Amino acid sequence: MAKEFLIELGTEELPPKQLRTLAEAFAANFAAELATADIAHEGVTWFATPRRLALKVANLAESQPDRVVEKRGPAVNVAFDADGKPTKAAEGWARGNGITVEQAERLVTDKGEWLLFKEQVQGQQTASVVVEMAAKALANLPIAKPMRWGDKETQFIRPVKTLTILFGSELIQGEILGVASARTLRGHRFMGEAEFTIESAEQYPAILEERGKVIADYATRKAMIIEGSQQAAQQLGGIADLEDALVEEVTSLVEWPVVMTAKFEEKFLKVPAEALVYTMKGDQKYFPVYDASKKLLPNFIFVSNIESKEPRHIVEGNEKVVRPRLADAEFFFNTDRKRPLVDRLPLLENAIFQQQLGTIKDKTDRITELAGYIAEQIGADVEKSKRAGLLAKCDLMTSMVFEFTDTQGVMGMHYARHDGEAEEVAVALNEQYMPRFAGDELPSRGVSAAVAMADKLDTIVGIFGIGQAPKGSDPFALRRASLGVLRILVEYGYQLDLVDLIAKAKSLFGDRLTNANVEQEVIEFMLGRFPTWYQDAGFSIDIIQAVLARNPTKPADFDQRVKAVSHFRALEEAEALAAANKRVGNILAKYDGELGEEIDLALLQEDAEKALAEAVEIMAEALEPAFATGNYQEALSKLAGLRAPVDAFFDNVMVMADDEALKKNRLTLLNKLRNLFLQIADISLLQK
């Protein structure tokens, strides 16, 4: 008979940013243990609050199924001697399995015949194995820094206070992490019953809510917070900024969410909204509120962990807590503006970017030069790009950014506007860090794009140049920086060559770099970002590899090629031409001599080779405009027309003729044919 199963681990406050991950891993690990043990069930559900991890298993079977274990013995020709008597090997095997040789069955396969013992193994009772399974599931949680507590040797992410393991109404005896299983559950720290007993797994989690004032279901708490915040914002005439990461964190901080609203003085709205929001979200875990035009309102939403008879006191307390932080932001903003950004440039000499690569002032000088170089190639204003590069890191020396680090860039923009800098320059100071994460917006075209690429390329080339390429960890976020550069080049269609950009960036370091292979390593590293990016976009890996085989170092050009090959692959002729290219490649690989593209028409004998030679010559001329403009889709569509003469050639012509001149001429024809395709991609790599 199947029953509900419950395990709850009561702890001290768990790290909020890890709570969901821990709970999901616990459930996944336990489900894997059940699968390994072959114990049937109808699903594992996890629960998590700041002070507990729990899971329930629906309709968990009371035991493993009985099973037959086949134990193969020695081969028959080894098990018996010439007289047909059992050998010592056979007798020893039989004795070890509690049978006689005569009781053994035979296993016959196409490889021979063996002795066989089929043992009937009774399934274990679920109650006898679940404690060990739960202990394993908990031991394999992703905990970076486990801790010890008291005088115990056990380790966990936080001290464990209670353990409850119920199978239906049966309390499963056992100990995990030094705590014995009991029926005691702990309620909310400040509301409900502090402790109470649970009689059966079916009562969970309802009993926690009814008696303990704890909503154990994570998704329920999260939904309450979102819905309550949206309603509260509407009542304020605004829209709540419910960033999912913050909602998750708040959900992980409360056991009984109560959504409340508060306000702050309107005078603080003179401070850039980003600084106020940084304080509200980062420090206090509040949700900012905006009006319909996305202007910050002097209100915020917060989530209390208790129901109070005097909610006004809680509101006033939160307002009192946030006020000094907002006042600090106001003070920093007013103080910083008394000094132009450019005046802070010398201060960058005192800030180290990287010991071998120099100060942030050194980096600023390189960014300035590289941004101007890039701007010239993409048609952006060179002087504005250089100015933005010069000012790019100056806000790091302001009080605001020193105190509120996440406001770097955006505060530079506000201060630049105050100083009267050109709008493009000011905006670039903020957008230099874009895209900040996967899926983030790109910097604006022109000046912002030039500065953003210059900053990222300087970091990538510099770190590779001193031999610190990322392996497991990536402390300088070089993968993200590389993808950022690639996205800007691809999505804006900038036909810039990475080889040129990297060489220019390298030259600006003077003799600081020690890695002689820095340019090639950076090229390979950046091109290595393409497969995952384009696979995520829906392109198959063989299409990507077909293009990468040509080592295209212009990202925008790579993009055009991938899309063209994807279009080509859908054509009726694609499969046959891909196979033909593979065949051609294999044939050419066996030839040791040098091949050009000059076909000797006088040596063409067969009608099929004459037809192919003529078709290739005509095609080569017809494709010149498409290749010149990078219209690879048009080029491949035209190349698809070669299928018929290619098929006829292989059906009727012996390439590896006995006559050396004839053979070389035919190989030259195939080489010219293959090179037409290779100007775009190696389509021989396309799979069926």
From Swiss-Prot:
GO biological process: one example: arginyl-tRNA aminoacylation
Any single Gene Ontology cellular-component annotation: cytosol
Keyword Cytoplasm: yes
Enzyme's top EC category: ligase
Catalytic activity: tRNA(Gly) + glycine + ATP = glycyl-tRNA(Gly) + AMP + diphosphate
Compartments where found: Cytoplasm
EC id: 6.1.1.14
Keywords for the protein's UniProt record, in alphabetical order: Aminoacyl-tRNA synthetase, ATP-binding, Cytoplasm, Ligase, Nucleotide-binding, Protein biosynthesis
GO-annotated molecular function: arginine-tRNA ligase activity; ATP binding; glycine-tRNA ligase activity
Pfam families attached to this UniProt entry: DALR_1, tRNA_synt_2f
Keyword Hydrolase: no
PANTHER family linked: GLYCINE--TRNA LIGASE, CHLOROPLASTIC_MITOCHONDRIAL 2, GLYCYL-TRNA SYNTHETASE
HAMAP family linked: Gly_tRNA_synth_beta
Family statement: Belongs to the class-II aminoacyl-tRNA synthetase family.
Known partners and oligomeric status: Tetramer of two alpha and two beta subunits.
Protein name listed in UniProt: Glycine--tRNA ligase beta subunit
